[in-house]
Swiss-Prot record:
PTM characteristics: Glycosylated by host. Glycosylation is crucial for glycoprotein export at the cell surface.
Membrane topology (UniProt): Single-pass type I membrane protein
Extent of the signal sequence: 1-22
Intravirion side: 569-588
Protein's job: Attaches the virus to host cellular receptor, inducing endocytosis of the virion. In the endosome, the acidic pH induces conformational changes in the glycoprotein trimer, which trigger fusion between virus and cell membrane.
Subunit: Homotrimer. Interacts with matrix protein.
Localization per Swiss-Prot or TrEMBL: Virion membrane
Tree of life domain: Viruses
Protein's recorded name: Glycoprotein
Keywords: Glycoprotein, Host-virus interaction, Membrane, Signal, Transmembrane, Transmembrane helix, Viral attachment to host cell, Viral envelope protein, Virion, Virus entry into host cell
Phylogenetic classification of the source organism: Viruses, Riboviria, Orthornavirae, Negarnaviricota, Haploviricotina
Tagged with keyword DNA-binding: no
Species, as recorded: Taro vein chlorosis virus (TAVCV)
Virion surface side, ranges: 23-547
Transmembrane segments: 548-568
């Protein structure tokens, strides 16, 4: 047993670290391709959203705690889950409410006159929505999606009586139907997002107030998938000093403090840590420190030489702990604290982390090494900024990836300003430059041919020392060649050129071609305003419509009459008195 332990430990002390080549570990047993074009154009890491970030101080405590070999730990077998953010779609109704007053009056001729006064739109009280929601939702299935609007009044006209006039006050509700994406929060609670203001509405509430009210049927929700998906069953170590779980197998570290406990989720009973990790604990075993385990071997050994060697190994491991692991935590904290517009993922003893800034505070976002990220084919690119679409074979999630970065994140989005960017570049006759972390792909003006690749000798993706047991070697699922990427870039540029026009022509035609997308957007905006005005007009009573028409034509008449009158007055010749000779009646 002692000999076996020595055989296992000596390579750690005296073995060589695998060399790092262009951001990935080289397999020494394989021939590595060394052509001029990089083949490892995949992102290396998958990082969370900014709301998963933690302060650097929290990360530092976990990092230093993971370095200790002299403290007792607890090993756990647990199943880690990631959140299945989108779980389906749900039909909702938007309710735009306005106060309304309905009147009845008997004329001198005995006729019953009815009129309505509708005020400007404002949200109705919650109890009004609770009262009318069942009646409105009963008709949901018969209404089409889209811009159709249905009018629902909470009151009827009062009866006409000769004795006096009568009035009633209530609400006019304009209803439209649409479908919104159904999402899940970290605890498995379904919710939707207000498309106008971004408010979160829990499904269990049945309604939500944004710019106007939203309502939906709770009993019609179909179970379209589980809120959680498993990331695998892994072995994690409980670091008692920082009360943190460290899971080297999936490069994840998280708080052991339970923020929420779910007893009946779609995956059974699970815990949610205070930093948002969902997990299920299978078993727990208390394990002594590494140094205590080595000392226990000393008592089992009969040979003095082996006993002495175990003591030396114990001391050597202690020195490695202080000189490598803890110093790495210190240096990494310094690197993370330096602000950068293009931060890189940094591997640490507690997994890979991405430095970021949140609310003026330096934070770190948890990441995981992910060799299952592949570039989608056919190649799909975005030119503003330059992004490539990739997909995770493990989760099915799709991301926009900036090739100058080593990671992907759900926060990265395509802005969609390709036409404007391409036109501005063409006016200056500048080449299009698409940057990768090892170089750049250049397409020269007028962008009607293939590009050229220029290498960037200084470009690299940071990868720290690989001696930590938590850092596993990355192997790529399928190598990607640069020509495959650049063909997709060429195709995208040519598509944008076709929509912009002949930008190589110096005449004004290119200008009008570039303006065409803006003209289309303006036309859509005008059409939207016109449809809104039409809907508003249909909600008015006849008396109000007559008043609006009279005011409109009065204003138009004044606009035409005033300039005309001024022009007529200016056209008349000015009055001048007739000059007559002066006749004196007296002596001269």
């Amino acid at each position: 047993m002692s000999i076996l332990v020595i055989i296992l430990i000596l390579p750690i002390l005296f073995g060589e670290v695998p060399p790092v080549n262009s951001g990935r570990v080289v397999d020494l047993n394989r021939n590595v391709r060394t052509d001029d074009h990089p083949t490892d154009l995949y992102p290396l890491y998958e990082c969370g959203k900014q709301d998963t970030a933690v302060p650097i101080s929290s990360w530092y405590g976990a990092c230093r705690g993971s370095c200790s070999i002299t403290r007792n730990t607890t090993d756990n077998t647990m199943e880690i889950f990631f959140r299945n953010d989108s779980v389906g779609w749900i039909d909702v109704l938007s309710l735009q409410t306005s106060p309304i007053r309905k009147n009845s009056h008997v004329t001198w001729y005995g006729e019953c006159e009815k009129s309505s006064d509708v005020s400007s739109a404002r949200p109705a009280p919650s109890e009004i929505i609770d009262t009318v929601a069942p009646a409105i939702l009963d008709k949901m299935d018969t209404w089409p999606y889209g811009g159709a609007v249905f009018i629902y009044d909470t009151i009827d006209f009062p009866e006409c009586k000769y004795t006096s006039d009568y009035s009633r006050s209530g609400w006019r509700i304009m209803v439209s139907k649409r479908s919104l994406e159904l999402k899940s929060d970290i605890s498995g609670e379904g919710y939707i997002i207000d498309p106008d203001l971004g408010f979160y509405f829990p499904i269990s509430k049945g309604k939500g107030l944004g710019r106007f009210w939203w309502i939906w049927q709770q009993n019609s929700l179909s179970q379209q998938g589980c809120y959680f998906k498993t990331a695998g069953v892994v072995n994690c170590t409980l670091l008692l000093d920082t009360y943190t779980y460290s899971c080297p197998g999936i490069n994840v570290a998280f708080s052991a403090r339970i923020g929420n406990h779910l007893t009946s989720s779609c995956v059974g009973e699970v815990n949610i840590s205070t930093d948002g990790i969902t997990y299920k604990l299978h078993n727990q075993v208390s394990v002594g420190s590494i140094s205590n385990q080595l000392i226990s071997l000393w008592h089992q050994s009969e040979e003095a030489l082996i006993q002495q060697l175990i003591i030396v190994i114990n001391d050597a491991l202690g020195k490695i702990e202080s000189s490598y692991c803890e110093s790495t935590c210190d240096l990494t904290e310094i690197a993370m604290s330096k602000h950068s517009d293009h931060p890189l993922v940094i591997e640490t003893p507690v997994g890979p982390w991405l430095p970021a800034s949140k609310g003026g505070e330096f934070v770190v976002i948890p990441c995981q090494s992910e060799p299952n990220l592949v570039v989608m084919t056919p190649i799909e690119t975005c030119l503003s900024p330059f992004l490539i679409k990739v997909k995770s074979l493990k989760t099915g999630e799709v991301y926009w990836w900036m090739p100058t970065e080593s990671h992907v994140s759900p926060d990265r989005q395509c802005l969609g300003h390709e036409e404007e960017e391409l036109y501005l570049k063409s006016t200056q006759r500048k080449p299009l430059q698409f940057e990768f972390w090892k170089g750049a792909y250049i397409i020269d003006y007028p962008y009607n041919g293939s590009g050229r690749w220029i290498m960037n000798p200084g470009g690299f993706i940071h990868r720290s020392s690989k001696w930590f047991p938590s850092l596993t070697e990355l192997s790529y699922t399928a190598p990607i060649s640069l020509p495959t990427i650049t063909e997709g870039v060429d195709k995208k540029v040519h598509q944008v050129i076709m929509s912009v026009g002949d930008i190589g022509n110096t005449t004004g035609s290119x200008w009008f071609a570039w303006m065409q997308p803006l003209g289309d957007k303006l036309a859509r905006a005008v059409g939207s305003v016109a449809s809104s005005l039409l809907i508003w007009w249909t909600t008015l009573e006849e008396e109000v419509k007559h008043g609006v028409i009279i005011v409109f034509f009065t204003v138009i008449g004044l606009i035409i009459a005033v300039p005309t009158l001024k022009m007529l007055l200016k056209g008349r010749r000015p009055y001048e008195p007739v000059k007559s000779p002066v006749v004196w009646g007296g002596p001269r």
